[in-house]
Amino acid sequence: MNAIIIDDHPLAIAAIRNLLIKNDIEILAELTEGGSAVQRVETLKPDIVIIDVDIPGVNGIQVLETLRKRQYSGIIIIVSAKNDHFYGKHCADAGANGFVSKKEGMNNIIAAIEAAKNGYCYFPFSLNRFVGSLTSDQQKLDSLSKQEISVMRYILDGKDNNDIAEKMFISNKTVSTYKSRLMEKLECKSLMDLYTFAQRNKIG
């Protein structure tokens, strides 16, 4: 099997590379940003794509969504040091085969790949957390739409309404609508509240 790694952290890339090579998986390419990722995947046609959520340019979830929309059928494993419930759920919804928390160790990537090869998904959290035992913050995060999540990430990156509108190909008015909705859903009355919420839940 072969793989493409998409991660902007040199140490993470090295750890993933070494892990894959030890398990007889060939590395076709190592990318540090999301802008060229879809094109490279479509050109090289790897069996496996490993993507960090927090890559520059086009983020990991957007790369995942685009690949699935363009009928890429290989194994996609998302890795992140961020909130595993929040990002894991959205990655599952977007078509990832697995989600691996960097905090739990990179070795789980191999477990995720093996699960995907055998027709299973690998998300190391109980689905019961999605329906029965969510914390208040997690319930709020789960209520956000994909568009609201994108707007939130851009806000946390310091982008203003004009920047967000340009990146999402929507109007300033629509950005304001999404912003108002997400602030209401998260019960944040100011941007400082939003930053505090994001820091508390390791989002950003």
From Swiss-Prot:
Pfam families listed in its UniProt record: GerE, Response_reg
GO molecular function: DNA binding
PTMs per UniProt: Phosphorylated by EvgS.
Record's subcellular location: Cytoplasm
InterPro entries according to UniProt: CheY-like_superfamily, RcsB_transcriptional_reg, Sig_transdc_resp-reg_C-effctor, Sig_transdc_resp-reg_receiver, Tscrpt_reg_LuxR_C, WH-like_DNA-bd_sf
Domain named Response regulatory: residues: 2-117
Start and end residues of each HTH luxR-type domain: 137-202
4-aspartylphosphate modifications at: D52
One annotated GO biological process: regulation of DNA-templated transcription
GO cellular component: cytoplasm
Span of the signal peptide: none
DNA-binding region of this protein: 161-180
Presence of keyword Transcription: yes
Keyword set, alphabetical order: Activator, Cytoplasm, DNA-binding, Phosphoprotein, Transcription, Transcription regulation, Two-component regulatory system
Source domain of life: Bacteria
Main location: cytoplasm
The protein's role, per its UniProt record: Member of the two-component regulatory system EvgS/EvgA. Regulates the expression of emrKY operon and yfdX. Also seems to control expression of at least one other multidrug efflux operon.
Subunit-structure text: Homodimer.
UniProt protein name: DNA-binding transcriptional activator EvgA
Upper taxonomic lineage: Bacteria, Pseudomonadati, Pseudomonadota, Gammaproteobacteria, Enterobacterales
Gene: evgA
